[in-house]
Every structure is written in structure tokens, then in C-alpha cells.
From Swiss-Prot:
Keywords: Acyltransferase, Cell shape, Cell wall biogenesis/degradation, Cytoplasm, Magnesium, Metal-binding, Multifunctional enzyme, Nucleotidyltransferase, Peptidoglycan synthesis, Repeat, Transferase. It comes from the Bacteria. It catalyses: alpha-D-glucosamine 1-phosphate + acetyl-CoA = N-acetyl-alpha-D-glucosamine 1-phosphate + CoA + H(+); N-acetyl-alpha-D-glucosamine 1-phosphate + UTP + H(+) = UDP-N-acetyl-alpha-D-glucosamine + diphosphate. GO terms for molecular function: glucosamine-1-phosphate N-acetyltransferase activity; metal ion binding; UDP-N-acetylglucosamine diphosphorylase activity. This is Bifunctional protein GlmU. Binds 1 Mg(2+) ion per subunit. Its cofactor is Mg(2+). It is an enzyme of class 2 (transferase). In the N-terminal section; belongs to the N-acetylglucosamine-1-phosphate uridyltransferase family. It is found in: Cytoplasm. One of its GO terms (biological process) is cell wall organization. Its main location: cytoplasm. The lineage of its organism: Bacteria, Bacillati, Bacillota, Bacilli, Bacillales. SUPFAM superfamilies: Nucleotide-diphospho-sugar transferases (SSF53448). It comes from Priestia megaterium (Bacillus megaterium).
Length: 68
């Protein structure tokens, strides 16, 4: 069986959104945007899920936790 990975690009301050929240943590339909991506990727048979973070890394990491 081959190894399959997914990479979530979750870096970015989101300054154009004019909000104190980081872009990937903005809620869409009751969940942070990044959670929608994680939910969809969790349906796949992946070896590992890698999340790239930048600005607000600690807040993003605290939400993502061990999901990636």
C-alpha cells in the first residue's frame, strides 16, 4: 500500500478580512474554515495530514491539535 499525505496550507494573517481572527479560524456554517478541510480529508485513507501554519500558529495549532 502506498503512503498518502495531505498538506493543509493554514498560514496567513487574513488582514484583508479586517478581523482579529486568523483567516483559517473564521467560522463558516458554524465551524472554522480549517475544520471543514480537516473533516473532508478525514474521509480519505491518508497516512498523515500535515498542516502548515504561520501567523497565529499557536491558536491554529490549539484548534487543529492532534488532527494533523
Amino acid at each position: 500500500m502506498s503512503k498518502r499525505y495531505a498538506v493543509i496550507l493554514a498560514a496567513g494573517q487574513g488582514t484583508r478580512m479586517k478581523s482579529s481572527l486568523y483567516k483559517v479560524l473564521h467560522p463558516v456554517c458554524g465551524k472554522p474554515m480549517v475544520q471543514h478541510v480537516i473533516d473532508q480529508l478525514s474521509r480519505l485513507d491518508l497516512t498523515n495530514l500535515i498542516t502548515v501554519v504561520g501567523h497565529g500558529a499557536e491558536k491554529v495549532k490549539s484548534h487543529v491539535g492532534d488532527k494533523s
